[in-house]
Structure formats: C-alpha cells, structure tokens
Amino acid sequence: MISSTGSSIPMDTLRISPVDICGRPHILRQSSADGPRRRPSLLLFGYAMQLRIKLYDLILAFANALDQVHPALTGHHRRVGFLLDRLAERLGLPSEERERLFLAGIMHDVGVIPLKTSAEDLVFERERYLHPQAGCLFLQNCPTLAEEAERVRFHHMYWEKACDRGLAAREGSLINIADRVDVDLRAKNDFREAVEGADRRVCERRPGIYSPDHIEAMQDILHDEETLNDLAGAHIRLPAFVRRRYGNQILTPQETIRFSTLFGHIIDSCSPFTATHSTGVAHMAVALGRLTGMGQDDLDTLFVAGMLHDIGKLGIPLALLEKPGQLTDEEFPKVKRHADLSRLWLDAVPGFERVSVWGGGHHERLDGKGYPLGLKGEEIPLPSRIMAIADVFTALTEDRPYRKGMTPPEALRIVKGMVKQGHLDGDLSRLLCDHADELDAVRASSQAEARRGFQALHDACAEPDERLRD
C-alpha cells in the first residue's frame, strides 16, 4: 500500500474499516469538468498528521450543536453544565465528581434527539424516563463516558428515589435540579425576573423532588451576583472557564474516533431515514481513500470527517429533512444551510481544521455549482472529493421519504451521470466502479452493524428501566 507521502503502509495498520480492500493501490490524477488535472499539493491534501484534539474542545462543540436542535434548547446544555459545577463546588464535592457532573450535564439531553417530536416534548416530556434512558445507552458506547452515562440515566429521577440508589442516582438528581432551574431561567425575557421565578419554584416544588441540601445550594447560586453575571454569559465564557477548571486533556486518535462515532450516531438518529447514513459515508470514504494511497493518519481524519459531515443537520427542522415531496424555493436554502453549519461547528474545534474542510465540503462540486462555498476544480481537496462521492453513493442506496433506495448498479449510473455533468471527480468514479463490490460491501456491512445498534436502542427504550419510573 502506498501512503500519501510515498511510504509503504502494512495492511495490519489499517484499523478503521471492518472490511479490508484488497488489490493494487491506485494513484489518482486530479480531474475536473474540463478534464485531467495534476494531483493537488500536500498543502491542499492537508499533510499527514495525527489527530490531537482536546477533550473539552470536542465536548463543548458538540454541546453547542445539541443546543441548536430546537430554539427551546438554545444554550441549555452549556448552562446546565455551568450550574452543576457551581452546585458541586458549594456542596464540597471532590474534583473528580465535579468533572464527571460537568461532562454529564453538558450532554444530559443527547437522548431527546431520536425521541423529539415538538418543543414541548423536548422540555416537558410526558414520559420523563425515556430520553434519559436513550441518552445513557448512547453514551455507554463511548468507554470514556461510561460513568457519565449512568448520571444521564438518572437525571430526571426525584431525590426521594435517588437518595438510596447509589452515587450515580444521587448525582443524576443533582442534574435534575440544574436542568429544571435552567428551564425556569429561560421562561421570561427579563433575566432578573426569571431568576426570581426560578428561586421561588425551587422551594415551591413538593417535598421529595429535590434534596434539601441541593435546594439550599441552588438558592445560594441564585442569590450570588457574581455567579448570576457569569450564568447570563455562560455560553460566551464557558470555554475559558472549562480550560481553567479542568485542564487540557488530549484525546488519542482512537478516542477521537470513538467520540466522533458516538456523535455521528446521535446525528443520524434524528430520522429513521438517515439512521445509519454517517456510518456508511465514513466507512466507504475510508475504503475509497485507502485505494488512493492515503496514509493511516489521513484515513483516521477522513473517518472522523465522515461521521461528522452532517452535524449541521441538527440545526435544520426535521420536517424539512423528512419532507416527502419536492422542496420549495424557500425551503431548499434552509436545508442547504446544514453544510454551512457543519463547517462552522467543526471549525470551532482546534485541531479539526481538516475535518471541517473535508467533511463540510461534501456538497462542493467540481464545476463550482456546489455549496456552501461554491469551490471549483483544484480548490476542492482530494479528501473532500472522496467524501462527496461516498455521500452521494450512500444516500442513493438508502430509503428516503420521497423514494426507495437504489440498487448499487443504479447508484453507480447516477454517479457516472454526475461526473459527466461536471459535479464529481471522474478518477474517483472509475475507482468506485472498478471496486464497486468491495466498496459497497464495506458500506452495507457497516450500516447493517449500525442498524443493529439502533434497533437495540429502540428495543431498550420500548422496555423502560423500572428504576426510572415514579
């Protein structure tokens, strides 16, 4: 195997795809609507470098994306995390517990995404235990977040049940009071009036919902002028606060991959029609990239970009994403905005510059008629071209509200047509056709595995954890 720098890569170092692509590696020419072009420089390729991402940079960026799911959630996860840190400080909890609570707090509602139907359901869900259970099951798939997952499981449990169920349940109940207070703080436009209302409601709730110690600590927070000023600007000040409080833990490339896989699954869970889309795109892009001679570090980055390429869809109304008919002239720009959001949110993570360009460029086209930037020809780096083909082929084979999924031969015909129209890279298209069976097997097997995971999540939520019921 020939790497992007020309060195040999042993097959046993190829870690990502469950199906290895065998056969002679291909060195691609760059092509465009106007014909063959020279291969881009490594500056466009992005250099071969390991992913070195800070844990909290990644977590905060994803919390920001979660906060865009609905206007009712804007800033919610970040403020809950901030409130939890201040609560833990006043309660005298050890630093390890404070950090665990903060992490759980800024991701506590990840389970609402596959269950959401309306703004009311997001905040005042009738079955309070369902989205905590879904969130816990999501987070358990990332070993780094195993303990936080248990806190998320119990974050709607009342104190009267949590107090004798262990540390995870007690800390989950602490998330509950921070969660509810933030909802109350957003109930009115006037922040000071909202603070007074939140303070009053903390005491008015019936005995047993919150711990008396938690109530006292929360009232201290709601009467502390400095804390209130910080809370009012928590979405602005939080990154600096986190770096000061919790340090700069660097994730290994494989940990970054696991986090990105988790986030990709959460993104895809927005709709049953896209429940395995990012998984298929990521694995197919890596398999195709491997055939071009990309090195392992670049393949790792390509995989992460594939898992996160549609993160911007969290900011698009589900009704538009699942519309069965043709989008109107007013609706199409709103859907296209997901690519802008993907680039914006990914670019906010230091070290994700290539992930942002490669993943956020999956709708760019060689003739300059793509989006979000309208890049043309050599302005589009090879990994972005790979992502575009992987995205198109995977999407064509999936069922959508407006059509049934195509067979691989039908999808290949569409890809070839897009090459003729000047949209997609001709060399990559030929490589796809030459290895169609192997590449489609990678896509199909990875999506089948992801589908089994979503089915397990669905089944688990259909049989709720009795510990979470009132």
Label for each model-derived stretch:
Residues 1-8, 15-17:
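Low-acidity, Ser/Thr- and Arg-rich intrinsically disordered low-complexity segments
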Residues 12-13, 27:
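Periodic, rod-like helical contexts
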Residues 50-470:
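Histidine- and acidic-residue-rich, metal-dependent catalytic cores
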Residues 16-18, 31-33:
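Intrinsic disorder/low-complexity segments
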Residues 37-48:
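Short, Lys/Arg-enriched N-terminal segments with co-localized hydrophobic residues
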Residues 25, 34-36:
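Intrinsic, low-complexity polybasic segments
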